[in-house]
Amino acid sequence: MRDNNNNNTREEERSSSSKQQQPQAPMSLKIIDSCLRLSVVPLSVATIWLTVTNHESNPDYGNLEYNSIMGLKYMVGVSAISAIYALLSTVSSWVTCLVSKAWLFFIPDQVLAYVMTTSVAGATEIVYLLNKGDKIVTWSEMCSSYPHYCSKLTIALGLHVFVLFFFLFLSVISAYRAFSPFDPPCDSQTNNDA
């Protein structure tokens, strides 16, 4: 009987202390979440603009544009999707009826984090091949012939990497929001006492 009273008292203390801390943590978390989402928009737009407007002519080799490389088209598409999603999710995160639906943010955040990872990997490979080439498959480096194109593409890739990191943080935040209402698993000693 005494153990039950102690357990009830401990549970009441935990619930009262967590109730006191809850209003503070979600609001600061919500502000961080919104700032990260809003930061994605200009970075993605800048990535798109730098990539799409990037072109350079060389009298020996001709024109080099973003649409001649399939991986850059993919990067532009992913950047556009991430900017639109970030804007819509920022607005909807302040709508009261959607805030309680943590899964509405968790699943797309996870998917976009993975898609951004593939996009960054593909764009990194392109920038690497443009800078270093691949002699085994007879792909020569092109940055000596197109220096402006390569430097602009490197900046776009850097911005795209920042967006990836923001989405990785957002996926952690949305996972915390989705799973925090659930109690942690009980240890075996607690189960034996019950």
From Swiss-Prot:
InterPro entries in the cross-refs: CASP/CASPL (IPR006459), CASP_dom (IPR006702)
Subcellular location: Cell membrane
Region (Disordered): 1-26
Alphabetized Pfam families for the sequence: CASP_dom
Cellular component GO terms, alphabetical: plasma membrane
Segments in the Extracellular topological domain: 52-74, 134-152
Keyword Phosphoprotein on entry: no
Membrane topology: Multi-pass membrane protein
Keyword Lipid metabolism: no
Keyword list, A-Z: Cell membrane, Membrane, Transmembrane, Transmembrane helix
Cytoplasmic face of the membrane: 1-30, 96-110, 174-194
Chain intervals with Basic and acidic residues compositional bias: 1-16
Quaternary organization: Homodimer and heterodimers.
Family affiliation: Belongs to the Casparian strip membrane proteins (CASP) family.
Protein name, UniProt field: CASP-like protein 2D1
Organism: Arabidopsis thaliana (Mouse-ear cress)
